[in-house]
Each structure stands twice: as C-alpha cells, then as structure tokens.
UniProtKB/Swiss-Prot annotation:
InterPro entries in the cross-refs: EF-G-like_DII, EFG_III/V, G_TR_CS, P-loop_NTPase, PrfC, RF3_C, RF3_dom_3_sf, RF3_GTP-bd
Disulphide connectivity of cysteines: none
GO cellular component: cytosol
Signal peptide: none
GO biological process: regulation of translational termination
Function description: Increases the formation of ribosomal termination complexes and stimulates activities of RF-1 and RF-2. It binds guanine nucleotides and has strong preference for UGA stop codons. It may interact directly with the ribosome. The stimulation of RF-1 and RF-2 is significantly reduced by GTP and GDP, but not by GMP.
Location of this chain's protein in the cell: Cytoplasm
Keywords: Cytoplasm, GTP-binding, Nucleotide-binding, Protein biosynthesis
Designated name of the protein: Peptide chain release factor 3
Annotated Gene3D superfamilies: P-loop containing nucleotide triphosphate hydrolases (3.40.50.300), Peptide chain release factor 3, domain III (3.30.70.3280), Translation factors (2.40.30.10)
A GO term for molecular function: translation release factor activity, codon nonspecific
Gene label: prfC
C-alpha cells in the first residue's frame, strides 16, 4: 500500500456530548463491533469492578466521568480509525478544545430525552468554527424521550445546521421495536429474537408480520413518508463543509444502531485534511515530508513508572520509529525511538504511522502543547493551539514541607498537561493555579495525592479575571493594587489577576496606556 492509499484509509474523529449522554458507552460499543475489545464495559457498572475501556484514570473510574481525552485506534473493514473520547465535563473544555484541533470529524451524542444540552452546544460551536463535519447519534431510544421530529427541529434551530436522518425509529421506550434504514429499506429489530424485515419502494412490508397492526409502526411509516416527500437528497458536500449532519437513532448501551452508524461513518467521513501553518502554507497529508503537532500531554499513564506521553497528530508524510525530526520551537533535532499507540491505558509500540494517526511520544520534558515536529529540511510551524482564560484561582502549597520535591514535580507535570495553569507572584514566589472550573482543582488535588503522594493545601485568592499585558515594559509597582495581583505565568509573561469586572474596568480607566488582553 502506497502513502496515498494509507492516508485515504484513515478516519480520525472525536466524540462530543454533554455528561451522561452516553458518549463513553458509544466509544466502547464502537470498539466492540470493530473487534478491538471482546467485552464492552459500561461506566454504570461500578459495583462490578468493571470500568469503561476509555476511562483509565483512577479518578475517572471512581466518578464515572471522563476528565482526560482518551485515544484509541482500531481497524474496521479496510479502514484504520482513530477515535478520541473527550472529556464530557464542562470544566475540561480546554482539553476538549485542543482535542478537536486534532480530528477531521466529530460525532455528537444526544440523549433523546434531553435533546441539546449546554455542553453539547458549546462543543458544537467549536466544531462549527473549525468547519468540522459532524455526525449525530441520538441515543437511549429504548427509554422514553422526545419525538424524532422534535429532536431534528431542535438540532436545526439550536445549532443552525441541516439534518438528514439516515434511519428512523419505530416507537420509543417500552414500545421501541427498532429502526428503519432509509437506504436499504430494511427494519432492524431491537430484540434479538426478531429477524430483519424488508420494505418495498412504497414502504410496505414484504413479509407478513404482526407489527403491521402496531400503531408505533404506522406512525413511523407516516413520519418517514413525510421525510421522503420532502425530497431532499443526502448532500455529502454539505456534510464535509459542516452545514449538514447525518442523524442516526439507536441505543449504545443496548448495542443497537451502533454498527449501522459505524458502517455509514466509514463511507461518508472525510480522510485526513490539509493543515495551515503560521507561514500560511497549506500542508497536504500526501506530502512526502513528515510533519506533526503535539496537542496533548498526559503524565502518569503508567503510575508505576511516572511516565509522560505527548500525543502527536501526524499531518503529512510517514512517521517511522527511529527517524530524526526537528522540534521547531527549539530548532533542535531529535531521534524518536519510543513511540506508542493506545487502547486507553494499554500501549503498543508504533513503528509506522501516516497522516491522521495519533501516536504517543515518550516525553522527558522536551515537548509543549502546540509544538510542531518536522522531518527533512522543512522549516514551518503549525498554528498555535488555543488556550482558555482561567476563571478560578487558588494558592497552592504542600501540606508537608518535606514533600517539596514531589510537590514541584507534580505541579510541573500536571501543568504541562494543560488542564491547569500556573502562575507565580513576583516577590514571594507563591504558586497560584488557575482553572476553567472547580472540578479541575478537585482532580488536581486527587492526582497529587494518588500519583505523587503529596497532600496539598489550596486557598482561594479572591481573584476571578486574568489579563495579559501587551506592553510589559510600562508596568510599575504602583499598578499593583488591593484589587489586583501581578503575577508571571509559566512562560514568564506578566499577568494581572483582578478581583472582578469592576476592578478590571477601574484599572483600564486609571492606566489607559496599559494594553490588556485575555485568552479565549
């Protein structure tokens, strides 16, 4: 297989949803149908001691939520699929955002009873901004929920995107019989003891079956006829531009409708895309020269070894283990001899990868999120990955002063993962951490104790707003007021932490010569 054929066989996507919509369960079932795992786990089964394959961190297993982005690769038919199961909790939107920079499409999971929820909307907007094609899986049809037309209308009106139902449900909850596949005109029954049924071109059953007397079946056929009479053909170009989403109905927990979705996904999802550089050069996935970028760093994937993995998306060319690459930020060459693929916390050495693949590089502190690696004589760098402005700030210290070495190592590694941000006061060197949401601090405290054996003391600093400074040379000590704290971030850039919006406006009016700015 040549490079072009290899690249065309790659499909790389992230799954996005509001917490508890069934995102991690869908991930499990996709792995199950691909043969990548023999038994699909479930995040609900905590009493059994079985946890979802993609929820590998101890705190995730205890809470039943995803707080990191898991990366898994599996083969299906003639395709190699890279799937990223993203954090569903809103406090981890920063990690999710970076993950969405590394994929070519997204799968949006919606709970049929709840419809579009806040986190779904937030992540959808990120996909829309990037023009990422979105597939929709409406989940939990075996429970009572909103009617199909109501759900489609909600998607179209709330998200401003066209919908195209690929299948249609018969009933819901206790009366859920199955789904009608529009393309094959077949009925896939929900219960295993039922056989697949066939419809003719007029949507009449070709076999005798008691379902013909069922009101749910009659209603489903009437609704489907209305959809068909609308006459809109599936527009693949609209999908690829992010203007249309194909919609699938099913129940991930019951293994139903998942394979139907997976078969359609590999048919319609895009292959790896070209990427823009800072130099405004478009790098094609078919370019012979290797390139990639780091979008995530994860410490302690193996707690026994205190390792750290940098997740790299291959953009072009072929990666070969042992090859020499240049880290563009430092302009230093390095030989990559330790590279790995993932099934959550299970790792396997990677000798070869092409555009679209996600591989892990063992990191001794060389990499930062957003780093570009290139082979040959290439000199470009990919565009920076976005960073969020924190909204909660805490002073942090070790409870036991004898644990300072472990404390600082833990801080350094967890900050480099990008889930929490680091600041230091100018004169006292007091460490202040910033986060998008409170859960990040809870996870930070949990991981410091479990992974670094350090109990930490955290104290709110009474500041809610961070503003960076364009003209640092004009900052003086008199600008450090009772309503603000002047700190340095991990890159030694000056940052003001303000008490509230009023304090920020007061500062801007009193010192108009100082140009402040925020991140995302």
């Amino acid at each position: 297989m040549n490079l072009k054929q290899e690249v065309e066989s790659r499909k790389t996507f992230a799954i996005i949803s509001h917490p508890d919509a069934g995102k991690t369960t869908l991930t499990e079932k996709l792995l199950y149908f691909s043969g990548a795992i023999r038994e699909a786990g479930t995040v609900k089964g905590k009493k059994t001691g079985k946890f979802a394959t993609s929820d590998w961190m101890k705190v995730e297993q205890e809470r039943g939520i995803s707080v990191t982005s898991s990366v898994m690769q599996f083969d299906y038919d003639d395709y190699k699929i890279n799937i990223l199961d993203t954090p569903g909790h809103e406090d981890f939107s920063e990690d999710t955002y970076r993950t969405l920079m590394a994929v070519d499409s997204a799968v949006m999971v919606i709970d049929c009873a709840k419809g579009i929820e806040p986190q779904t909307l937030k992540l959808f907007k990120v996909c829309k901004m990037r023009g990422i094609p979105i597939f929709t899986f409406i989940n939990k049809l075996d429970r009572v929920g909103k009617e199909p037309f109501e759900l489609l209308d909600e998607i179209e009106e709330t998200l401003n995107i066209e919908t195209y139902p690929m299948n249609w449900p018969i009933g819901m909850g206790q009366s859920f019989f199955g789904i009608i596949d529009r393309k094959s005109k077949t009925i896939e029954p929900f219960r295993d003891e039922e056989n697949i049924l066939h419809l003719n071109d007029d949507f009449e059953l070709e076999e005798d079956h008691a379902i013909t007397n069922d009101s749910a079946f009659e209603q489903a056929i009437e609704e489907l006829m209305l959809v068909e009479e609308a006459g809109e053909a599936f527009d693949n170009d609209a999908l690829l531009s992010g203007d249309l989403t194909p919609v699938f109905f099913g129940s991930a927990l019951a293994n139903f409708g998942v394979q139907n979705f997976l078969n359609a996904y590999v048919d319609f999802a895009p292959m790896p895309n070209a990427r823009q550089t800072k130099e405004e050069v478009e790098v094609s996935p078919f370019d012979d020269s290797f390139s990639g970028f780091i979008f995530k760093i994860q410490a302690n994937m193996d707690p026994k070894h205190r390792d750290r993995i940098a997740f790299m998306r291959v953009v072009s060319g072929a990666f070969e283990r042992g090859m020499d690459v240049t880290l563009q930020r430092t302009n230093k060459k390095q030989k990559i001899t330790r590279s790995t693929s993932f099934m959550a916390d299970d790792k396997e050495t990677v000798n070869h990868a092409v555009a679209g693949d996600i591989i892990g590089l063992y990191d001794t502190g060389n990499y930062q999120i957003g780093d570009t690696l290139v082979g040959g004589k290439q000199t470009y760098s990919f565009q920076d990955l976005p960073q969020f402005t924190p909204e909660i700030f805490m002073k942090v210290s070790a409870k036991n002063v004898m644990k300072q070495k472990h404390f600082h190592k833990g801080i350094e590694q967890l900050v480099q993962e990008g889930a929490i941000q680091y600041y230091k006061t100018l004169h006292t060197n007091q460490i202040i951490l910033g986060a998008v949401g409170q859960l990040q601090f809870e996870v930070f405290e949990h991981r410091m104790k479990n992974e670094y054996n350090v109990d930490v003391v955290m104290e709110p600093v009474g500041r809610k707003i961070a503003r960076w400074i364009e003209n640092e040379d004009q900052i003086t000590d008199k600008m450090n007021t009772s309503r603000s704290i002047l700190v340095k971030d991990r890159y030694d850039d000056l940052v003001f932490l303000f008490e509230n919006e009023f304090a920020t406006r007061w500062f801007e009016e009193k010192f108009p010569e100082i140009k402040l700015y925020s991140l995302l």
